[in-house]
């Protein structure tokens, strides 16, 4: 539920995304998108397993899907495939929301030679003041969070687009004043 929840918000607020384990569906989605995509395991955390795929690497997609989806015991895993948001290489913003209202934010910047901005993946943290666009995003999603009983969450935002809602373990409390 954690990583799937953000799909409940309108597409205007988030990048185009699919959650699937069907190779054909994933290939079609990948072909229909721009030049870059983000692939992440549905059950991952802390940036583990999150990779940036460029369209020119399409010939390697079968190998990636074998690794991410197919288990040796014959079972399969779901993956999230998300349209790349320009500017993601500059990091993301983690916003903590309590009772539908933002209580603080931090900018997470990727480490050297990495696209992931998670602190556990080598990213660093900077102070951040919410932009007008980020405040508006919080205003739009806050009521639904409360309605769904999600009183304390961390959302990840890139260029005003919602990329993830962390409902189980919204890290970042210690970094926010």
Identify what each model region corresponds to.
Residues 18-19, 84, 155:
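Glycine- and other small-residue-rich loops at beta-strand/loop junctions that grip anionic moieties
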Residues 7, 52-54, 168:
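Short, glycine/charged-enriched secondary-structure capping and boundary segments
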Residues 28, 106, 173-176:
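Generic domain-boundary/flexible-linker signal
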């Amino acid at each position: 539920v954690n990583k799937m929840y953000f799909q409940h918000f309108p597409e205007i607020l988030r990048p185009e995304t699919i959650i699937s384990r069907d190779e054909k569906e994933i290939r079609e989605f990948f072909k229909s998108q721009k030049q870059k995509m983000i692939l992440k395991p549905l059950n991952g955390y802390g940036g583990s397993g999150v990779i940036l795929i460029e369209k020119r690497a399409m010939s390697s997609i079968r190998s990636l899907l074998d690794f991410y989806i197919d288990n040796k015991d014959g079972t399969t895993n779901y993956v999230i495939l998300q349209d790349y948001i320009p500017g993601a290489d500059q990091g993301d913003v983690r916003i903590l929301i309590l009772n539908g209202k933002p209580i603080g934010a931090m900018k997470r910047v990727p480490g050297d030679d990495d696209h992931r901005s998670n602190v556990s993946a080598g990213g660093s943290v900077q102070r951040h003041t919410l932009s007008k666009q980020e405040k508006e995003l919080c205003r739009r999603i806050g009521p639904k969070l409360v309605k769904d009983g999600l009183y304390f969450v961390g959302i990840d935002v890139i260029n005003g687009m919602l990329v993830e809602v962390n409902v189980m373990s919204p890290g970042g409390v210690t970094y926010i004043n």
